Each structure stands twice: as structure tokens, then as C-alpha cells.
Regions:
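Metal-dependent phosphohydrolase cores
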Residues: 1-102
């Protein structure tokens, strides 16, 4: 995972506010997409481990192959990388510009 975090593409997230210009109205809204992505990766990892533990304790609930550490890595990486490909203006770009281009 460190190999991905250390790339220039991921490091550029340090310069992007997660909430755009909201920090002008809400002074505490200053976290970056980098910080957000690290946090989402952490939560993805914790959630996955919780689901694995629940699967082991319940005969009726089987989320996925309990013994697969690659599943944990994949879901953690999905959390880490979920914001990496956003265009300018983030979700506004996703909703408006991409829709217009279709």
C-alpha cells in the first residue's frame, strides 16, 4: 500500500481540499482528499475485519472467503483509491460534465 501512497498521483491529493471551498464558510473544514482517503482506507480495513469476525461467529452469515487476506487488501485499497480519479470540482464534475459528455 505504501507503494501507492508514495506515488505523485496519490500525493497530489494533499493539495486538494475534500470539501472544496467550504473552509471559507466552515473554518474547520480544512482536511484534504489525502487525509480523507487514508481515513477511508482505515475504515474499510476495520469494516472488512469486522465482517470476517462476524462470518466466523455466525453459521448463517458468510460475507466472503474468510481465509482470503487478498480480499482484505482489495477492499482496503478500494477505500484508499476511491477519490483518486475525480476530475476538477469532484462530484460536481461527475454529475454535470460527464453527464453532458455522454
Amino acid at each position: 500500500m505504501w507503494e501507492i501512497i508514495d506515488t505523485p498521483e496519490f500525493q497530489r491529493l494533499r493539495n486538494l481540499f475534500q470539501l472544496g471551498n467550504a473552509h471559507y464558510v466552515f473554518p474547520g473544514a480544512t482536511h484534504t482528499r489525502f487525509e480523507h482517503s487514508i481515513g477511508v482506507a482505515y475504515l474499510s480495513n476495520r469494516l472488512t475485519h469486522h465482517l470476517i469476525k462476524s462470518s466466523k461467529e455466525s453459521k448463517s452469515f458468510n460475507f466472503f472467503d474468510i481465509n482470503s487476506e487478498s480480499n482484505v487488501r482489495c477492499l482496503t485499497l478500494a477505500g484508499l483509491l476511491h477519490d483518486l480519479g475525480h476530475g476538477p470540482f469532484s462530484h460536481l464534475f461527475d454529475r454535470k460534465v460527464i453527464k453532458t459528455l455522454k
